[in-house]
């Protein structure tokens, strides 16, 4: 979440270098999630994979919020970084695959670009809002809110018919 760097560096005292190192290492898990998620999306469908990854990400946020006693454990924080990166990779590639499926072939490049721009806009707005609500929520509360926001759009996956656009 947008709170992670503040929590890890300022509250848990990791330091910028240590946080950057482990965040960089966790990025490899995101790459693995993207590659593996692509294969799985081809096998079970991008809607189902997006739903599973979104639920997994929300669950990981709830577990993290509930396990405050483990926050001082470097292994727990690194595990959370890896899990978040991996599940985010699976989620994003599944959403990308779904966006490609629902794009109308005649204007697919333009339509897909618009979908990607909206996904990037939502991430940017989310990061920006983090600063605005920082004083209103505890770190634990932020992760609970993140879990709720992660689950909020998932029911929309049920009404998307990838074959309707074609």
Model-derived regions, located:
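C-terminal ends and interior cores of transmembrane alpha-helices
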Residues: 55-72
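Multi-pass alpha-helical transporter architecture, strongest
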Residues: 146-166
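A late C-terminal transmembrane helix in Major Facilitator Superfamily
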Residues: 106-136
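A membrane-interface helix-boundary motif in multi-pass transporters
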Residues: 129-152
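Cytoplasmic membrane-interface "Motif A"-like loop-to-helix N-cap segments
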Residues: 42-56
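Helix-to-loop junctions at the C-terminal end of transmembrane segments
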Residues: 33-46, 134-135
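Intracellular juxtamembrane helix-capping segments at the cytosolic ends
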Residues: 89-104
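Short amphipathic helix-loop junctions that connect adjacent transmembrane helices
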Residues: 2-19
């Amino acid at each position: 979440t947008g709170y992670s760097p503040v929590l890890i560096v300022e509250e848990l005292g990791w330091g910028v270098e240590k946080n950057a190192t482990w965040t960089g290492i966790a990025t490899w898990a995101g790459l693995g999630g993207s590659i593996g998620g692509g294969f799985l999306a081809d096998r079970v469908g991008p809607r189902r994979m997006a739903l599973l990854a979104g639920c997994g990400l929300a669950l990981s946020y709830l577990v993290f919020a509930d396990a405050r006693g483990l926050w001082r454990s470097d292994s727990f924080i690194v595990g959370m970084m890896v899990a978040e990166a991996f599940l985010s990779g699976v989620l994003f590639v599944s959403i990308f695959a779904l966006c490609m499926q629902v794009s109308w072939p005649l204007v697919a490049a333009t339509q897909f670009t618009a979908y990607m721009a909206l996904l990037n806009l939502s991430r940017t707005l989310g990061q920006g809002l983090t600063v605005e609500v920082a004083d209103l929520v505890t770190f634990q509360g932020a992760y609970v809110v993140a879990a709720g926001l992660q689950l909020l759009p998932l029911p929309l996956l049920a009404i998307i018919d990838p074959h309707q656009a074609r």
